Amino acid sequence: MIGLVGKKVGMTRIFTEDGVSIPVTVIEVEANRVTQVKDLANDGYRAIQVTTGAKKANRVTKPEAGHFAKAGVEAGRGLWEFRLADGEEFTVGQNISVELFADVKKVDVTGTSKGKGFAGTVKRWNFRTQDATHGNSLSHRVPGSIGQNQTPGKVFKGKKMAGQLGNERVTVQSLDVVRVDAERNLLLVKGAVPGATGSDLIVKPAVKA
């Protein structure tokens, strides 16, 4: 089953009939418009390309304008691709709404996490800080040793050190679908999802459901 592209609106909470508070993320899923259908004969795999939202006319490049015009759809804010399963069929220009998730219990949500800039090991990797006193005057938040000796004489790949934190593609799996509001194009999922308010999200049925 394909997924949909939405926009993170923010977090709130809803209450069950028993008065239990559920933290939810609100995702606005406007109609996803099919801009291209890829098939085995021409592309070697089956997939659809979709767009959503709108883009100012002066921000649409000529290649983009031609691509959207050929599909007969309004220029969107980006292009995304979803692989098709056997038996799934879509046509160029078709609109896919949030009702796609009407019978889905759990979803995987992919987004770009908030960028935190250059961060030390305590913030980035949850390293313990060293002693505040007892003779320690300069090394409270330093990572400590990063290697051994002349053998192996190098720092191993993957060593946890200071560096860029966040601003990377992150997927949160198996979030419960709390509500599908087709009238307002909203999808409510339990818990937090990656990214800042207003950022694009890819929502797919959970692979581990």
UniProtKB/Swiss-Prot annotation:
GO BP annotation list: translation
Top-rank taxon, per record: Bacteria
Pfam families: Ribosomal_L3
PTM comment, free text: Methylated by PrmB.
Keywords: Methylation, Ribonucleoprotein, Ribosomal protein, RNA-binding, rRNA-binding
Subunit record text: Part of the 50S ribosomal subunit. Forms a cluster with proteins L14 and L19.
Similarity field: Belongs to the universal ribosomal protein uL3 family.
Free-text function comment from the UniProt entry: One of the primary rRNA binding proteins, it binds directly near the 3'-end of the 23S rRNA, where it nucleates assembly of the 50S subunit.
Name used for this protein in its record: Large ribosomal subunit protein uL3
